[in-house]
Each structure stands twice: as C-alpha cells, then as structure tokens.
Amino acid sequence: MILALWALLAVIQLSAQSGYGINPVFDGKLIPSSRIKETYINGTQLAPYKLRVFRSVKFTATPAELSRIQALLLEDGKGAEDRQTEYTGGVLTYALFRFRAEVHSSRYDMPVEGNKYLCLQVFPKETRYDVTLVYMSGDATLDELKQLFKN
C-alpha cells in the first residue's frame, strides 16, 4: 500500500510539470539526486497561498552545470506570458516565468484557468553556485506571490 502511494505521488509530480525542458533537474538527471534537497507540497496546505503544487530543489552547481540549467530554463521561458530576469556579472541569478495553465477542478473535473511558475535563484560562491529552482502551480497571481515572498 505504501509503495503504491509513493508510485502515485511520483506520477502526480511528473504530470504536474510535464512539458518543461528543465524537468531533468527536478528528476535528478542533470544533478545527482544525492546532491539535491527536494521539497514537494500539494493539497490543502497550499490553499491559503492559492497554490496547488509547490516543488523546489536546492543544490550546489559547477559553472558547467549552471550553464546547462540556465540554457534549459531560458528556453522554457520563451513560452512564458510574464518574464523577469536579473543577471550579475553575466550570470543569470534570478528568473521568474509565469505560464497560463489549464488545470482540472477536483470537485467537478472541469478545466479551470490557473498559472504555472518556474523560478530560479542563484547565489555565487567562490567557484560554485548555490541554486534554488522552484515549480509552482495554482491560482496565485504574480503580484500575490511577490507579496508572499516579501513577508
């Protein structure tokens, strides 16, 4: 039973953010899973924030790894409705992309509009980079998320 629950959770995680080139980072295929700290939250815990899914990965990357991650993320960002990026010394240190999403209401299984977000934050450290990559989906607007993260 527990194994079935874990398998279901894995399928939900994959389907929640399918279609993004950055997915190999979340799946531990670009950065070894042993170097990644992952957080995954869904359901009622996120309701006060108008989100359905929150998934983040944190890790330390080499310059080559960061370059690959940035290329994947920027390619995904081409399809975004809203984009915010910041560079420091030629390195992408902040990115926030908002995509429109069709999600299904759990109550009626009817399509409803929502948002999907990909966020990147990079902190340079001597010869490596501390990286946080976040995927979120829900009804929260960009302004609401900005307020949430300010507090």
Model segments located where?
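Short, exposed beta-strand "edge-strand" segments with a Pro/Gly-rich flavor and a Y/T-containing core
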Residues: 33-41, 80-84, 133-140
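Bacterial Sec-dependent N-terminal signal peptides
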Residues: 1-22
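Residues that form generic nucleotide/phosphate-binding pockets
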Residues: 25-29, 72, 148
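Mature extracytoplasmic domains of secretory-pathway proteins
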Residues: 53-112
